[in-house]
Amino acid sequence: MAELLILEFDGVTESEYRSVNAELGIDPETGKGDWPAGLITHLAGLAEGGRAFVVESWTSREAQAEFMQNRLGAALGRGGVTATPNVTWATLIGEHHPGG
């Protein structure tokens, strides 16, 4: 079963989010780029009060851990993200895209 990851950051801006993606060589707007193996879905959003959320589904926690160790950790630093996120994992029991 796939795994759901929710990351909640305090004080991360849209500019920093875009910088991290540029460091990774991915473009969330077009879907093009060097997306990590094991990533199924990626969503990101900003909330009031300077909070940023990333919600992803992965084939396994191990696949995400490998991505974090080999690419994402360094890209976060180079992109200016120094805050440690709140991390929540859950087993994914449903994923639907009714609108397309």
Positions of predicted regions on the chain:
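Short S/T/G/P-rich N-terminal loop/turn motif that feeds into the first structured element of a domain
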Residues: 1-70, 80-100
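Short arginine-rich
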Residues: 75-79
